[in-house]
Amino acid sequence: MQFGELVKALAAVESTTQRSVMVKLLASLFKKALPEEIDKVIYLILGDLRPPWEGLELGVGEKLCLRALAKATGTSQAELESMYKKTGDIGEAARRALASSKRPGLLAFGSQKPLEVSEVYDALIKVARATGEGAQDMKIALLSSLFARSSPEEGKYIARFVVGKLRLGVADMTIIEALADAYGVRKEDLERAYHVYPDLGHLAKLVASGKPLDEVKVTPGVPVLPMLAQRLSSSSEILAKLGGAAICEYKYDGERAQIHISQSGVRIFSRRLEDITHAYPDVVKAVREAVSAREAILEGEIVAVDPDTGEMLPFQELMHRKRKHEVAAAMEMYPTVLYLFDIVYVDGEDLTNEPLIYRRVKLSEIVHESDKVQIAKWQMFDDPDTVDVFFHEAVSVGTEGLICKSPTSEYEMGARGWNWIKYKRDYKSEMIDTVDLVVVGAFYGRGKRAGLYGAFLLAAYDPSSDMFYTVCKVGSGFTDADLKKMYEILQPLKIPHRHPRVSSKMEADVWFVPQVVIEVIGAEITLSPLHTCCLGAVRPGVGLAVRFPRFTGRYRTDKGPEQATTVAEMLELYKRQKKVAQPE
């Protein structure tokens, strides 16, 4: 496939505001791709070179990209920086530079063989793998060569890709729907395979080659999509929902981790499927000593503890582990305990279809507890009063509450069902729980906030439609430093119109690709004609909103947009409020 054909499709996707049109455009593109290149097409659309757990990054910043452009076009770096500053889009700066270049050495587009998708992808792989002495010069040489062969429009998307600002916001579920349409496979079969092996490039190659998806198996070293929980606010409701009995375990305030043990060693993956092994060398060592299985996939929570008292510390303290040069110091200041709560696979046996009570037995058989690795504290209950006693015990030792689970439940990869239910402590006069919402738009600040965004339009996610529905406009709770940080992280995601996966009645001053997730609290969930979340579910023409929303200060960098609070959860929160709200 010619790269220009991919670029033409990307431009069409970028210009649409309808998700259904986006799916059709992608399906049409996939039909034209050869089986041996479909994976590369998909990786480029998603803005990645490989799946997230491989951690392959280009290592190209904006300045290096502009240096490569300067070399390819003969345009000065100062002029390119000026173009970039004026447009706010490095892709547009690249397009203009390539369109206006009169450098004799620049190969005229059209007088040569057009770029192929595979050529572009392979060149970018070489850029990513250039390391060591002279790596920067090698990256510049490879990129400038690529720009020199690009049309202005092709260069626009190459520049955006290499600095991680593609701005398409195409989600994995959108790709799955388009693949199902293009190759005539059942969307449900693709989803199941994706939950087990969440590498869309790999899966696309399988379906394009006519290979059966049922051959996709749970594999140590490849993270599965984690099972997720719903939420309720009373023990009696929880037990009723779970059939009268529940395994209740402490809900630790840490980083959820998927631990993979194989012949190649121990690897740790985040809930976003990223390899975070480098941040937890102490956990790797502790797992090697505590787990007797040759191969296993375990689920747990990594919790920071006070080195002097052993008390559990808030999740935020683990952020010190994210800076590679600070890991050694962070291990001393913020040691961790791994609390294991599930097992997905052990020594050739896929346990995802086994009941939880059986998985618990398997977990206890292979884990030899220590001060660094423990099995999450749990008990079986069938009485709400005893659940509440256990709940208060959990809160008193520093946890967030309980996770209550059906003893007979299978491990439902990627699902947020009613077999796992969060039971968290009440926030007194505020909402029952915080919500994690996606930033989809912003409003310009005034006065002290001039030059920044003063408020943000937030949305909940609907997995069934793969859409984001607005819930509130929030401007409270942000410090001056927060507002500056929000502006910086959102600028690369700025787009000229509402994203096709966003449903909104409100007109924001600025729209973004749905990507950034933040935690919000409020007075209550109320009915509102201004927002689209659960529109018509309670009353015709009226949606749900967070009343008096406030940013808690917590950036949910551990969550992707599709892991945010769902519209179904918002409806459940509304229904369980003691007082039914009236329309605003």
UniProtKB/Swiss-Prot annotation:
Enzyme class: ligase
One protein family per Pfam: DNA_ligase_A_N
UniProt cross-references to CDD domains, sorted A to Z: Adenylation_DNA_ligase_Arch_LigB, OBF_DNA_ligase_I
One GO MF term: DNA ligase (ATP) activity
Keyword DNA damage: yes
Keyword Zinc belongs to the record: no
EC number: 6.5.1.1
Gene3D superfamilies: DNA ligase, ATP-dependent, N-terminal domain, DNA ligase/mRNA capping enzyme, Nucleic acid-binding proteins
Gene Ontology BP, a term: DNA recombination
Disulfide-bonded cysteines: none
Essential cofactor(s): Mg(2+)
Superkingdom of the source species: Archaea
Record's catalysed reaction(s): ATP + (deoxyribonucleotide)n-3'-hydroxyl + 5'-phospho-(deoxyribonucleotide)m = (deoxyribonucleotide)n+m + AMP + diphosphate
UniProt binding sites for ATP: E249, R256, R271, E301, F341, R416, K422
InterPro entries, per database record: ATP-dep_DNA_ligase, DNA_ligae_ATP-dep_bac/arc, DNA_ligase_ATP-dep, DNA_ligase_ATP-dep_C, DNA_ligase_ATP-dep_cent, DNA_ligase_ATP-dep_CS, DNA_ligase_ATP-dep_N, DNA_ligase_N_sf
Keywords: ATP-binding, Cell cycle, Cell division, DNA damage, DNA recombination, DNA repair, DNA replication, Ligase, Magnesium, Metal-binding, Nucleotide-binding
Role according to the record: DNA ligase that seals nicks in double-stranded DNA during DNA replication, DNA recombination and DNA repair.
Family per similarity comment: Belongs to the ATP-dependent DNA ligase family.
HAMAP family the record matches: DNA_ligase
Protein name: DNA ligase
Source organism: Pyrobaculum arsenaticum (strain DSM 13514 / JCM 11321 / PZ6)
Encoding gene, per UniProt annotation: lig
